[in-house]
From Swiss-Prot:
Keywords: Conjugation, Plasmid, Repressor, Transcription, Transcription regulation. Pfam families: Prok-TraM (PF09228). This is Transcriptional repressor TraM. It comes from Rhizobium radiobacter. The keyword Repressor applies. GO terms for biological process: negative regulation of DNA-templated transcription. Negatively regulates conjugation and the expression of tra genes by antagonizing TraR/AAI-dependent activation. TraM may either bind or modify TraR or AAI making them unavailable. Alternatively, TraM may bind tra promoters preventing TraR activation.
Length: 102
């Protein structure tokens, strides 16, 4: 099954994923997407744990900076970057696969 770039590119955020996944059988693309969903869930959990560990002044925006805050920001960047890739995979695949919660 070849996907039409014209149909996908209107909503895709990460164009390199179109080329990387071009020609893949739908089952392989679904496997990649399911793995990306699981990765995203782990990253969300990690970022949330780091946020919850921040002092209240950081959570409310009254303070910022320092190693602990930087670790949270880096985890959030990683989580959001993964979400962009995941949204692109959803667009290419054409649906959101069901994934059992671990």
């Amino acid at each position: 099954m070849e996907l039409e770039d014209a149909n996908v590119t209107k909503k895709v955020e990460l164009r390199p994923l179109i080329g990387l996944t071009r020609g893949l059988p739908p089952t392989d693309l679904e496997t990649i997407t399911i793995d990306a969903i699981r990765t995203h869930r782990r990253l969300v959990e990690k970022a949330d744990e780091l946020f919850q560990a921040l002092p209240e002044t950081y959570k409310t925006g009254q303070a910022c900076g320092g190693p602990q805050h930087i670790r949270y920001i880096e985890a959030s960047i990683e989580m959001h970057a993964q979400m962009s890739a995941l949204n692109t995979l959803y667009s290419i695949l054409g649906f959101i696969p069901k994934v059992v919660v671990n």
